[in-house]
């Protein structure tokens, strides 16, 4: 167990840094946006989308992880700002023990992993929807529920695995800061944060290409075409999410991982590390983008289809033009 100690000069400078404080305010703004946009995102997913229930369950789970992450990270950001504004002259009380921070850190790591695992779960679910001969309501619900449980389990053990044998005898400025004795696991953690989103992105693109080709093979079968349209729209949204989240996760995992390596090799100073790392920590932005991107994608899809139908009903067409218009509407 760590004993209470005064903050080092470096930690004092970090707490006083306007760079560090501005980053916390921006993160809090992301948190507020997440909370405000989650409810309309849920309403759209449940009532206005073409998603099957298996897809809806995993999307709702992603939103749950995003909001839970923002709650716990927001508590730490507010604590940091309180220390900055009211405790700058009391540097023997601003540090926290790693052992006391462990419960918060487990949730932060677990929910971060949960957002990533849920995307992988969506890829598996979309693969099932694409290749299973019959993917009706009952089967899709069983598959979706099973994947949701597995994702939740993986998320719940992520934080525990990260610090399971760490003595947690150090001091940190905030509970979102990783323990110093778990350095060896950083590389594994950041590798997972890069490889899984890249895998998700690759699979989603392949599925989208496959579904588009399959749609045209059944273009004169209205029922089959409509069912495939549902799959394509759902997969397109998942692909859109995967690409957006991959970019931010890549910045986070590669950027922070590289900074930690440079710091460990004494190539950069702790001050330089502290200056840069706050702008590479993109997880609050990822959590914020989940509901925003869902709202954008679902509304855009509905708007495009409505405009196409309105245009279709206003035009008098020949049989050839009618077939061409039908092809465009379903593409």
Curated annotation (Swiss-Prot):
Keywords per UniProt: Membrane, Transmembrane, Transmembrane helix
Pfam family, one: 7TM_GPCR_Sra
Domain of life: Eukaryota
SS bonds (residue pairs): none
Membrane topology recorded in Swiss-Prot or TrEMBL: Multi-pass membrane protein
Spans traversing the lipid bilayer: 26-46, 58-78, 104-124, 142-162, 189-209, 238-258, 275-295
Cell compartment(s), UniProt: Membrane
GO BP annotation list: detection of chemical stimulus involved in sensory perception
GO molecular function, one term: G protein-coupled receptor activity
GO cellular component: membrane
Family according to the record: Belongs to the nematode receptor-like protein sra family.
The protein, known as: Serpentine receptor class alpha-9
Gene that encodes it: sra-9
């Amino acid at each position: 167990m760590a004993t209470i100690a005064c903050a080092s000069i470096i930690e004092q400078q970090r707490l006083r840094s306007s760079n560090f404080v501005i980053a916390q305010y921006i993160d809090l703004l992301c948190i507020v946006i997440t909370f405000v946009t989650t409810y309309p995102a849920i309403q759209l997913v449940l009532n206005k989308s073409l998603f099957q229930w298996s897809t809806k369950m995993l999307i709702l789970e992603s939103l749950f992880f995003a909001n839970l992450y923002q709650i716990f990270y927001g508590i730490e950001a507010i604590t940091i700002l309180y220390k900055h504004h009211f405790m700058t002259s009391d540097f023997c009380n601003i540090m926290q023990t790693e052992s006391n921070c462990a419960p918060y850190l487990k949730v932060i790591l677990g929910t971060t992993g949960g957002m990533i695992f849920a995307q992988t779960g969506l890829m598996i679910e979309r693969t099932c929807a694409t290749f299973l001969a019959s993917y009706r309501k009952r089967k899709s619900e069983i598959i979706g529920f099973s994947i949701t449980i597995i994702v939740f389990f993986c998320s719940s053990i992520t934080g525990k695995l990260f610090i399971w044998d760490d003595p947690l005898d150090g001091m940190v400025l905030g509970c979102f800061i990783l323990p110093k004795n778990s350095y060896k696991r950083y590389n594994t953690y950041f590798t997972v944060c890069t490889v899984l989103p890249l895998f998700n992105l690759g699979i989603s693109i392949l599925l989208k290409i496959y579904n588009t080709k399959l749609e045209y093979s059944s273009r004169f079968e209205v029922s089959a075409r409509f069912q495939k349209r549902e799959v394509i729209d759902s997969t397109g949204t998942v692909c859109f999410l995967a690409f957006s989240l991959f970019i931010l996760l890549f910045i986070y995992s590669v950027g922070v991982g590289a900074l930690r390596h440079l710091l460990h090799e004494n190539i950069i100073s702790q001050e330089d590390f502290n200056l840069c790392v706050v702008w590479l920590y993109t997880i609050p932005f990822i959590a914020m983008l989940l509901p925003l991107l869902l709202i954008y994608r679902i509304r855009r899809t509905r708007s495009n289809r409505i405009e196409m139908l309105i245009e279709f009903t206003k035009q008098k067409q020949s049989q050839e033009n009618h077939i061409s218009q039908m092809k465009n509407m379903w593409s």
